[in-house]
């Protein structure tokens, strides 16, 4: 089974922090063979108060998804992500088919 991050967040409020997160994320994502699929269309909100965007990140395994999140290099990147927007990140195991 594959591992996933599901990131649900409000619209980006700090573009500079988001750009720094993206810069730091690239080598980390490559290290863990992550593939992301940011939604270009806002999700249809049916049972929540606020959700501006959804990103699905696919990993080869649940262990890889957890290890990536726990990687010290991601700690630095995460600071910028949390500065850029208010978000929720869930880690789960499954098979969603083609994510990218």
Language model segments and positions:
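Short S/T/G/P-rich N-terminal loop/turn motif that feeds into the first structured element of a domain
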Residues: 1-53, 60-70, 93-100
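C-terminal structural segments of small proteins and small subunits
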Residues: 66-70, 74-90
């Amino acid at each position: 089974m594959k591992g996933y991050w599901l990131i649900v967040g409000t619209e980006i409020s700090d573009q500079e922090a988001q750009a720094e997160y993206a810069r730091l994320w690239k080598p980390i994502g490559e290290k863990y063979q992550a593939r992301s699929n940011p939604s270009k269309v806002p999700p249809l909100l049916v049972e929540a108060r606020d959700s501006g965007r959804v990103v699905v990140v696919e990993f080869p395994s649940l262990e890889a998804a957890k290890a990536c999140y726990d990687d010290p290099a991601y700690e630095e990147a995460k600071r910028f992500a949390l500065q850029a927007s208010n978000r929720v990140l869930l880690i789960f195991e499954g098979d969603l088919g083609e994510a990218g």
